[in-house]
Amino acid sequence: MSIRKCFLWQISCVVSIQLITTVQPLAAQTASESERLQKLERAVELLQKQNAELKAEVNSLKSKETASVPDGKFKTKVTYDGKTYVEKAVVEEKKVPVYVQQAGSEIKLVLGGFIQTNFEDGNVSAFEGRFGQTALKDRFRLRRARIGMTGDFAQNFDFKIEGDFEQNDGTSPSSRVDFSGTDIWLNWHQFPEAQIKLGQYKAPFGLEQLTPDTTLLIIERSNTTGAITPDRQIGVELWGKPFTNIWPEQKDLLTYYGGIFNGNGRNINNNDNNNFMYVGRLELMPFKGKIFGQESFLKLGGDVLNSRDDAGTNISQSGNLLVNSDGSLSSFVLPGADERTAWGVDAWFELGPFDLIGEYLEEYVNGRTVNGVPPGFANFTTDGFQITSGYFLIPKKFQAAVQWQYLNPGQKGNDGIYSITGGLNYYIHGNDLKLMINYIHTWSDFRQANPEFGQDEFNEVIGRVQVMF
């Protein structure tokens, strides 16, 4: 018999004896009816008090008995004693939850990333001049697979560190998937009007280039952007919003950027020479509000760039600029020293579900003779534009987009490349989960003027799945 059962039996005996000893004297007495009732009431009160004390003791014993049984779920454990298998229920130990704690004193730490996977069919990347001797084959492509972390310190510093498991075509040292740094920077933001950012990130030049990869209306950026803008560089910049405190309602009215960079690309710590790339950008938002009850804005921008580069520097970081003998394009790696000067203007107008974006870029590439060594190429001017429009057929869900782009490399007569893109975007869960499909038709002026090199019009279909986390 268990301790609990023995104790309950003792309680029953005590209660029974007390009832007998209390009720019998009451029955033998000859007192008045009221006195007998009073005695019965006192006896009942006494019994209730004793019963409450006994219940308290029973509960105490129950809790002790329960505490002797380990916490957790039971699982079946099978043992073998040499003759038979024995099954026994044993307590499964609870697992300690996994957690991550930052080593520093950040007040904010966010881990995230995104994956973009492409299907590319037809004349793959013909809009980038990838035809003829630089043609690519139909493929599935891991376009971007990035993971990064951002943080914020109470001492007015924020930072970002991000890496990518894929590279743009032509920038990877091998044909395999690589991992390399993209954004790695630290920003001091105590004064919103004058912030200091240093590390590796996109130099502030070009609206389409500075638009995040995950929010583009067209799957790929125009080749004009890729060929002329400097993309990611290592350096430092001063930037800010001058009206943040003096005119908070119009803090986005003006934003300025001014930076100094090595000028020879990302993930390269050694500068190509003792000169730097100087980049500046101004953004003006003269209007932000409602038109016809729709959220709207107008943003204008302008860029300038100057850089003195040595031989071996790639001056088309994420696009193709060098005109080959058959009119196709490839990355422009300088055979000798140069000095580049570039500028651009852009505008973005949004009216509810409608977006209209336009940008023009121009660059002058002039050779320099260094230590008696000629540059090895003729001076040239390259320019181009892109105009992009988007409209939500179903608000926030289904969007149609179109883009017209043109690049004039300026190295051979009639070497321009035009492309028109039509696309559909389905936002399953905003930009976090998005499907995109584009059809691109491309014309080559050089191929049209020189039909002996083959076709001068090209078609491509690109599909993309995007997941952000």
Task: Pin down the residues of each PLM region.
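N-terminal periplasmic/intermembrane-space "pro-region" immediately following the signal or transit peptide
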Residues: 26-116, 123-128, 248-251, 469
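Outer-membrane beta-barrel pore domains
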Residues: 134, 172-174, 185-189, 200, ...
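Bacterial N-terminal signal peptides that target proteins for export
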Residues: 2-13
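Outer membrane beta-barrel
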Residues: 96-306, 380-410, 415-420, 444
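Low-complexity, intrinsically disordered short segments enriched for Gly/Pro and polybasic residues
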Residues: 10, 24-25, 74, 78, ...
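C-terminal segment of classical bacterial N-terminal signal peptides
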Residues: 17-26
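A general secondary-structure boundary signal
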Residues: 37-41, 47-61, 65, 114-116, ...
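Acidic-residue sensor for enzyme active/binding pockets
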Residues: 33, 41, 53, 57, ...
